[in-house]
A protein has these predicted regions:
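Anionic, Ser/Thr-rich low-complexity intrinsically disordered regions
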Residues: 50, 58-60, 73-77, 83-103, ...
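Short, amphipathic alpha-helical segments that act as regulatory/interfacial helices
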Residues: 69-73, 134
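Short, well-structured N-terminal submotif of metal-dependent ribonuclease cores
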Residues: 2-67, 75-88
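Short, function-defining helix-loop hinge/capping sites that tune catalysis or transport
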Residues: 41-43, 134, 157
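Generic structural signal for beta-strand residues in well-ordered domains
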Residues: 23-24, 51, 95, 115, ...
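Active-site neighborhoods of divalent-metal-dependent phosphate/nucleic-acid chemistry enzymes
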Residues: 17, 99-151
Length: 164
């Protein structure tokens, strides 16, 4: 997969997308939700690792990186992760960050997250991920949601997305 160039924010500008416009992606868009990324980083989940190596453009919410970083720290503090494994997980997280489009949590994302979803109840952070996927300006048929979370999976399917 070709390396994507990164673009930096200009002072005073707050674009919804921090990398090249996601709207330009026509097919093969894969929204990576935090539970799936953590399954790859901490559990080496084979199906998620395969999904992360599949063809397509990867996109995630900026929320994913905060969630993943906190989960890695919690795992180390709880004694479930050795220091070397923590370092490997952090490296993997940074590698993923360089490979994907990152969508900021905007007021539009938060407004959508605050409205009902087809399958309730939905936790707030899950609603933010679902709202982010919905606001990508792509038809659901062109987006695959990669997740390990049952609530996200059920809602993604109800919204017309394919799920891995």
């Amino acid at each position: 997969m070709a390396k994507r160039s990164t673009t930096r924010r200009r002072p005073g500008r707050k674009p919804a997308f921090r990398r090249p416009a996601v709207q330009a992606a026509v097919a093969g868009l894969r929204y990576i939700e935090s539970s799936a990324l953590l399954a790859a980083l901490l559990e080496h989940d084979a199906s998620v690792l395969a999904a992360l190596q599949a063809d397509g453009r990867y996109v995630t919410s900026s929320l994913t990186f905060a969630e993943a970083a906190r989960a890695i720290i919690r795992a180390r503090v709880a004694g479930r992760l050795a220091v070397a494994m923590e370092q490997g997980a952090v490296r993997g997280l940074r590698t993923f960050e360089r490979r994907c489009f990152i969508v900021d949590v905007t007021s539009a994302v938060l407004a959508r997250a605050g409205r009902p979803f087809p399958v309730e109840p939905v936790r707030t952070l899950d609603a933010v991920h679902l709202a982010t996927a919905e606001l990508l300006a792509e038809p659901p048929q062109l987006v695959t949601i990669v997740t390990r979370d049952a609530r996200v999976r059920d809602n993604a399917r109800a919204l017309g997305y394919s799920v891995e």
